[in-house]
Amino acid sequence: YLDRVRKGTARMGELIDALLKLARIGRAEPGIVDVDLSALAAEVVAGLADAEPGRVVGVAIQPGMHAQGDRTLLQNLLENLLGNAWKFTRGRDDARIEFTRQVAAEGREWFVVRDNGAGFDPDYASKLFKPFQRLHSQEEFPGHGIGLASVKRIVERHGGEIEAEGSPGKGATLRFTL
């Protein structure tokens, strides 16, 4: 019984921390600098790999991706997007995650995080970026349901937009502009 209380208390603390992070995103004026997104993504992935040393994930990060933005907020964004890709590819022998840049026909630059993980039903894509909305059970994939809401807020603070595509069992693709 005491163990359940401890776990519940720890989870509540994590949730409060996540909510505080979400609330802070909208307050401070972002400090805009040149951010090497490729290097930042590599740091995030290294941290994920260190936390699960036995796990093998094929990760491809396009070199030379830069953006103007708040480094701390963009780190939070990549921690959430790449962390989700890492989490939702768990259990796959051939887990793959990509972080690339695409230039659309009109010249707009999109940054893309793609994985071959659990994916999601495209009918529920609009719910992905709302706080506390989860498309997978807590038992299957732990989380608070705040990460993608934070990502959306960060993207919007940078004047960008975000969209998601997915297919159950085939993975997810999240694209954003800054």
List the predicted regions and their residue ranges.
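Short conserved segment of the HATPase_c
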Residues: 120-132
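Conserved catalytic submotifs in the C-terminal HATPase_c
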Residues: 33, 53-66, 102
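A conserved beta-strand-to-alpha-helix junction within the catalytic ATP-binding
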Residues: 31-46, 98-101
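Short alpha-helical segment of the dimerization/phosphotransfer core of two-component systems
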Residues: 7-12
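Short helix-loop "hinge" at the ATP-lid/N-box region of the Bergerat-fold HATPase_c
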Residues: 85-89
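Short alpha-helical Gxxx[C/S/T] motif in the catalytic ATP-binding
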Residues: 5, 147, 151
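Detector for a conserved hydrophobic position within an alpha-helical segment of the HATPase_c
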Residues: 155-156
